[in-house]
Amino acid sequence: MSDISHVILYSKKNCSYCIKAKNLFINLGLNYTEKKFEDFKNIEALFEDAGKQVRSMPQIKINGQLIGGYNQLIEYLIDKKLVNFKGEPIK
């Protein structure tokens, strides 16, 4: 897990996959910074911060790299051997 040091979660209100991502980070013991869609002054500011024109939430950046949404996060964590194919933490 040592190679995952800086996590940013772009989220918005009432987003079930945002909540799933937060819970997963907590269960894995990963610290993260949450940036809420509603806190950006405009959509361009969000695009600039994320580094891409994002179309859905959540969006996750790890160590400066935009991973993508929740499904891409699960794929990333499977590759790191931190979760199983169901997205459950591997103990």
Task: List each model region and its residues.
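Conserved residues at beta->alpha junctions
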Residues: K12, F37, G64
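Non-catalytic, surface beta->alpha helical segment in thiol-disulfide oxidoreductase systems
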Residues: I62-I90
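Thioredoxin-like thiol-disulfide oxidoreductase module
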Residues: K36-V54, D79
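Local sequence-structure signature of Cys/Sec-based thiol-disulfide redox active-site neighborhoods
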Residues: M1-T33
